[in-house]
Amino acid sequence: MFIRILGSAAGGGFPQWNCNCANCAGLRAGTLNAKARTQSSIAISDNGVDWILCNASPDIRAQLESFPALQPARAPRDTAIGAIVLLDSQIDHTTGLLTLREGCPHEVWCTEMVHQDLTTGFPLFNMLEHWNGGLKWNPIALSGNFSIPCCPNLHITPIPLRSSAPPYSPHRNDPHPGDNIGLLIEDRNTGGTLFYAPGLGQVSEELLATMRRADCLLVDGTLWRDDEMLVREVGTKLGSEMGHLQQSGPGGMIEVLDGMPAVRKILIHINNTNPILDEDSVEREILGEHGIEVAYDGMNIEL
């Protein structure tokens, strides 16, 4: 299995256009040892030729241009993207579908709840239906697994996660299974297994059992501490209120990952305020001591 990190930041990217926190200001000034990052999205493939896009970031055009494998140029109009899988209906995971409209029709895989949001509160399916057939919905059931024709050797198991629908959703305050999912992806040729969950707010015993099956964990790295947005004076909500498990402290992501046998443990969807973006920070050093990596745009993983 080939995995390309197209974008590794949380919503807004890094630096965020209107943010002057220490990280964003430091990166702009050239005083911070850090890499700029676009909003999170990955591409996966079983052969390195045909690819599945997992989430469609607002930064998708720049991300596609940065990865030549996604433009094989076999015809006057071409793409190596054979399908798109949406893990949720968040704006920063779906807005890129608008940028991809010239390539319609697209095969889009998502749950019933995500499809509801994207035909009501943020009606992308409706908006794009006049673009050469628009978005073709392939339902993701919350039980069993599925494969996608362009990458038939990748068997994908959806994992329902405990989190909320986006703020715009008609059922924002009425959570349903399928609002957010993680993916357990197994390459039947190599046996390599990836667990991908860029938005992870709570970890149940059942989820821990699933995570233990993976060779590589690519999981939520949004915030170092739950009150990070408040401490940095750039927000009013706790990470837990936004559906993100902090890295530090009892029950945090570091503690969760310490109990995992995976060969690689990688954080993705990193908020611009997170001190782990500073490669010289104490927090980054702590991650290294625990064998935890930090995803960056352009990172390649092979399983």
UniProtKB/Swiss-Prot annotation:
Give the signal peptide as a residue range, or say none if absent.
none
Classification via Gene3D superfamilies = Ribonuclease Z/Hydroxyacylglutathione hydrolase-like (3.60.15.10)
Which UniProt key words apply to this protein? Answer: PQQ biosynthesis, Transport
SUPFAM superfamilies per record: Metallo-hydrolase/oxidoreductase
> Among the record's GO biological process terms, what is one?
pyrroloquinoline quinone biosynthetic process
Q: Which InterPro entries match?
A: Metallo-B-lactamas, PQQ_synth_PqqB, RibonucZ/Hydroxyglut_hydro
Pathway listed = Cofactor biosynthesis; pyrroloquinoline quinone biosynthesis
Any Pfam family from its record, for instance, is Lactamase_B_2
Give the similarity note.
Belongs to the PqqB family.
Function statement = May be involved in the transport of PQQ or its precursor to the periplasm.
Give the protein's recorded name.
Answer: Coenzyme PQQ synthesis protein B
- Origin species: Stutzerimonas stutzeri (strain A1501) (Pseudomonas stutzeri)
List the taxonomic lineage. Bacteria, Pseudomonadati, Pseudomonadota, Gammaproteobacteria, Pseudomonadales
Corresponding gene? pqqB
